[in-house]
């Protein structure tokens, strides 16, 4: 039978407004309809096929698409809705059957409707000329008809030519169920309600920038795109005091060759005051590294990704922009905001969290689905599509790649065997014209550098081009080396090198090597390479010793491959045999010690291989430059990336608030305790399995920051693997501590341990005692408590003497970075004449000024002449002669803003002393010659020859070449600012470096005492003495004091000291 569908003879329509997932919808109520209807693009839910004939005044129509609206806060059970654009003003139509099931009550007195025990306001609207619909429901369902499903989507634009008949048939049936996910150009774009973008700024003062002037053609384009965004509901008119200018950037021409443009908003000033969102963006290498052993890949393309996220209401006004026609603001998240990528990544992780790393991986709006079989892959696609549909997101299905054996993802081609460069970008490189300008060189190197991991010895090949980027360097495109470098890079990209994807079940091998000018490394498994890396050494690194360069290669390579190596046992292969004893070096030096500490977070073994067997890494580190290689441009590795791996720390777990301790035993038991305010969970287990580890993580990893201790590396690998698989289901940051100390329960027990150890070890001092205790025990504020206990020790107070510094401590002299930064002066005497000798440390430029006497006035006048000729230095270093030590000369130098630094007694400065030896040698040579004219101008001839004629051994240049054409540090204000900023850290670094040398054979004196005086002895009257020790006063009778003086060598004149 045919039933009339909802025609209101009064010409008025009754509807209610419901809120579902944060969005309001208009629901038309029709007691005469036996079905429910919903407009297209309201919800992205899987479509079922159920035919229904509808008769209208214009003729019959057929409805085929049915969605099942899931149970929610409004509808208490799943309800069917036919998909059809039945109205332009309403979103849904609720029929009689649903109204009856909901036990609806319409109260016209109060204009309310009760639906499922919830009351809504009844709204009446005027007629909108809807069609008069008559429906006839057919009982049969055709949901199982695959032939019907094939007709639902236009697959002519889909990329399915690579599929066989079975794959095509199954895929089309699956895609048709999710037809509502497809976005077509011109449709109204939906948005997700899982997240809103919030603009947190440092202040609320409006940011206003004037509109940029645009060409007339661009103004027309801007207005057209603004109108389109208004129609789609992406923007609205604004009254905001904020304003950011619009500009136009060109896009690729369309198929007809017509120019295309994109309107963008310049949010740079807004971004400057935006507080950065530290949500981690995944590392591309890390994502690509998880795609091994897969046979099928599907890449998903979200439609206008950022625009599918709603703006927070309070942040909308900050996105305001203006055009010639008006002032607008974004309702959806626009492109160009500082934190937009982080918000989008957070959104995608929240939506797909249960599927990440198991079925799919996400990088911003790029989603890749991976599986090992067809059935598994189709199931993975359905799971991902269901999550996206629940989040109300739209896809550009015609741009997606389905069931591919080779997928284009993040600029690479992912295959079951490995990763290959993208052929599209390879084609762009091949057709690239030879660069003739700096900007073109940088663009080309940026394009090829994107694939540098596939090119062994990239730094060597690109060197002739990178060297052209130096200042004042002419680009010679006819130069053979330049052309060869350019063509070779293109030829190497044309090749199809395939790198193996990492298998995290196997052991990694990191092979490194360093040459005089570059570093190289290769990461491999079972002899198959995973990635090649190389870079040149900078000017500072060129002066490193052989072992320093080899260790630098290891430090740099482990940092680059951190996400592969951290938390895993791996092997380092090097042809530098001394590195095998890296951990056993007693005095490695400050630089090696810092690098050794940096490598301590890794678990590795160093193996020696012969140089000829290390051909790959050796080739990567060889850079063949015939001359002037010291100042060549340097290629640097990428910054350290974020990682999902459990990080390691050498700090004992006892110092952390949330502790989880794994103990292997014959029991399976969990205990909770608390000590010193720290929460401790002790998990006893017999055998660790992956399933057990996952359950432990889900049950106990519930806090924001957790530190774990697990002794067995094998069991830790299992926990690590479990954490990687479920890391995106929690917000927990996990650190593994390598040490577990014994907690001392009470102060009495703590004091007993200290006193017993202190006596047993013959009364060590505070620092030694603290270190000994902390090796095996933990007690809060132990250092301060140990200090108090030892301060009260009578034996220490009476027996230990003072250690006074007798000489200045040895310090490493920092190298100057400019000419005129540091002068070294001394008094030089020869043949009855006296001179002030001066040498610039940076350039080795030397000069002498004659003086009549050695008093400070003559020295000042000589220094004035030197400063007039050479310029004033920042630092003047001199011996402790009477003239240089005079207070008058020091004050004059302070007025001239020159810092004076005096050497210790009997400790000459090597540079100027060597200059004196050279001058004496030259004088003896001149005196032995017969040239009388030269004898009359000995000093002038010697200085001219020294500065202008001879290259210095240290610099490799003539001193005058460096000194006369170098800049002046006083005028370089930016560097002065940078040095002031670094001053605090500089002092600390110098102190740390000095500690390695203060115990060495060159340190003749004792160290300066950083502590305050601790003991003072004075005679109060003829019969009594008073000893003050750390504010504790003890009185002695003279006979008792003399006895202690004899036994402990105390004296009244004794100065304060430490133990």
UniProtKB/Swiss-Prot annotation:
Record-annotated active site: 30
GO terms for biological process, alphabetical: DNA integration; proteolysis
Sequence ranges of Polar residues compositional bias: 1050-1059
Region (Disordered): 998-1059
Biased composition (Basic residues): 1027-1048
Catalytic reaction annotation: DNA(n) + a 2'-deoxyribonucleoside 5'-triphosphate = DNA(n+1) + diphosphate
Gene Ontology CC entries for this record: DNA polymerase complex
Domain Reverse transcriptase: 230-414
Pfam families in the record: Integrase_H2C2 (PF17921), RT_RNaseH (PF17917), RVT_1 (PF00078)
InterPro entries (UniProt xref): Aspartic_peptidase_AS (IPR001969), DNA/RNA_pol_sf (IPR043502), Integrase_cat-core (IPR001584), Integrase_H2C2 (IPR041588), Peptidase_aspartic_dom_sf (IPR021109), Retrovirus_Pol_polyprotein (IPR050951), Rev_trsase/Diguanyl_cyclase (IPR043128), RNaseH-like_sf (IPR012337)
E.C. no: 3.4.23.-, 2.7.7.49
Keyword Cytoplasm set for record: no
Top-rank lineage group of the source organism: Eukaryota
Stretches assigned to the Integrase catalytic domain: 812-967
Record's protein name: Retrovirus-related Pol polyprotein from transposon 297
Native source species: Drosophila melanogaster
Lineage, broadest ranks: Eukaryota, Metazoa, Ecdysozoa, Arthropoda, Hexapoda
Name of the coding gene: pol
